[in-house]
Curated annotation (Swiss-Prot):
HAMAP family: HisB
Cysteines joined through disulfide linkages: none
PANTHER family the UniProt entry points to: IMIDAZOLEGLYCEROL-PHOSPHATE DEHYDRATASE, IMIDAZOLEGLYCEROL-PHOSPHATE DEHYDRATASE HIS7
Classification lineage: Bacteria, Pseudomonadati, Pseudomonadota, Gammaproteobacteria, Moraxellales
Species, as recorded: Acinetobacter baumannii (strain SDF)
Record-level GO BP terms: L-histidine biosynthetic process
Protein name: Imidazoleglycerol-phosphate dehydratase
EC supergroup of this enzyme: lyase
Family: Belongs to the imidazoleglycerol-phosphate dehydratase family.
UniProt key word Cytoplasm: yes
A Gene Ontology cellular-component term: cytoplasm
Gene3D superfamilies, sorted: Imidazole glycerol phosphate dehydratase, domain 1 (3.30.230.40)
The gene coding this protein: hisB
Length: 202
C-alpha cells in the first residue's frame, strides 16, 4: 500500500528568461522556514505570509529586470511558485483538495477559497483604497495571482470583504491564502490513496 503521508512532497523549479532568473524550492510539509529574496521587499513580505501561516518551507531567489519596473519579477515569481506547488503535489492522491479561510487584520477581513482542481481560474475582488503601498503598485497582485493559479493548476477565489488600509487588505488576503492552501494540500488520512474527484483525476 502506498503511504502518502511518508512521501516527501518537495519540489525545486528553475525558470530563466531574458527578464528574470528564478529558483524556488518548496516543501509542502515544512515548518515555515526558508529564505525569500525576490528583489522586491514588499513581495517578500507577502510570500512570507504564505510560508509562515501555511507552514510551507519556501526558498526563492530571483534576479529580475528591476531597472525597468517590478512587473516581470512579481509575475514570474507567481508563475514559478505555482510550478513548484504543482510539482510538489504530484499525482494529488490523498489531498483534501479544497481549502478556505477568513483572515482578519485589524479592520481588514479577507476570504480565500482554493480548489486544487487542475483547472486554472482566478476570481479576485480586492477594492484597494490606494494605488500603491509604499512604492509597490497594487495592480501587480493580480499578475502574481494569475501566474500562480495558471501554473499551480488551481481555482482561486479571493475576496477582501472589509478594509480601509491597503497594506492590511492585501496582507489579510495572503494570510487567508496561506491557511486555505494549507488545508487544501493536507493529506486526508481517511482517503490517502484516492483522488478527491468523481472523475478519478485532478
Amino acid at each position: 500500500m502506498r503511504n502518502v503521508s511518508m512521501t516527501q512532497r518537495i519540489s525545486e523549479v528553475v525558470r530563466n528568461t531574458n527578464e528574470t532568473k528564478i529558483r524556488v524550492r518548496l516543501n509542502l510539509d515544512g515548518t515555515g522556514q526558508g529564505t525569500l529574496n525576490t528583489g522586491v521587499p514588499f513581495l517578500d513580505h507577502m510570500i512570507d505570509q504564505i510560508k509562515q501561516h501555511g507552514l510551507f518551507d519556501i526558498d526563492i531567489h530571483c534576479d529580475g529586470d528591476l531597472e525597468i519596473d517590478d512587473h516581470h519579477t512579481v509575475e514570474d515569481c507567481g508563475i514559478t511558485l505555482g510550478q513548484a506547488f504543482a510539482q510538489a503535489l504530484g499525482d494529488k492522491k490523498g489531498l483534501r483538495r479544497y481549502g478556505h479561510f477568513y483572515a482578519p487584520l485589524d479592520e481588514a477581513l479577507s476570504r480565500v477559497v482554493v480548489d486544487l482542481s487542475g483547472r486554472p481560474g482566478l476570481f479576485m475582488d480586492i477594492p484597494f483604497t490606494r494605488a500603491r503601498i509604499g512604492t509597490f503598485d497594487v495592480d501587480l497582485f493580480s499578475e502574481f495571482f494569475q501566474g500562480f493559479v495558471n501554473h499551480a493548476l488551481m481555482t482561486l477565489h479571493i475576496d477582501n470583504l472589509k478594509g480601509k488600509n491597503s497594506h492590511h487588505q492585501i496582507e489579510s488576503v495572503f494570510k487567508a491564502l496561506a491557511r486555505a492552501l494549507r488545508m487544501a494540500c493536507e493529506i486526508d488520512p481517511r482517503a490517502e490513496n484516492t483522488i478527491a474527484s468523481t472523475k478519478g483525476s485532478l
